[in-house]
Amino acid sequence: MAQRTRLGDLLRPLNSEYGKVVPGWGTTPVMGIFMALFLVFLLVILQLYNRSLLLDGITVNWNGLG
């Protein structure tokens, strides 16, 4: 028999919806928006690293990071 703990009692409500699927798209569009924003963020970082995106007055020195 499993031992009951206070932490387990606090976390039990989080697991009460296990296995249930909400019909429809749910929060999928929100996830898609955040994934697109994260992609834009990564592209900006990549362009800064490759010096394809130059910002006036901001010098980028990647040698200090290594």
Curated annotation (Swiss-Prot):
One of its GO terms (cellular component) is photosystem II. Gene3D superfamilies: Photosystem II reaction center protein H. Its main location: membrane. It is found in: Cellular thylakoid membrane. GO terms for molecular function: phosphate ion binding. It is a single-pass membrane protein. SUPFAM superfamilies: Photosystem II 10 kDa phosphoprotein PsbH. Keywords: Membrane, Photosynthesis, Photosystem II, Thylakoid, Transmembrane, Transmembrane helix. The chain crosses the membrane at residues 29-49. GO terms for biological process: photosynthesis; protein stabilization. It comes from the Bacteria. PSII is composed of 1 copy each of membrane proteins PsbA, PsbB, PsbC, PsbD, PsbE, PsbF, PsbH, PsbI, PsbJ, PsbK, PsbL, PsbM, PsbT, PsbX, PsbY, PsbZ, Psb30/Ycf12, peripheral proteins PsbO, CyanoQ (PsbQ), PsbU, PsbV and a large number of cofactors. It forms dimeric complexes. Belongs to the PsbH family. This is Photosystem II reaction center protein H. It comes from Synechococcus sp. (strain RCC307). The lineage of its organism: Bacteria, Bacillati, Cyanobacteriota, Cyanophyceae, Synechococcales. The gene is psbH.
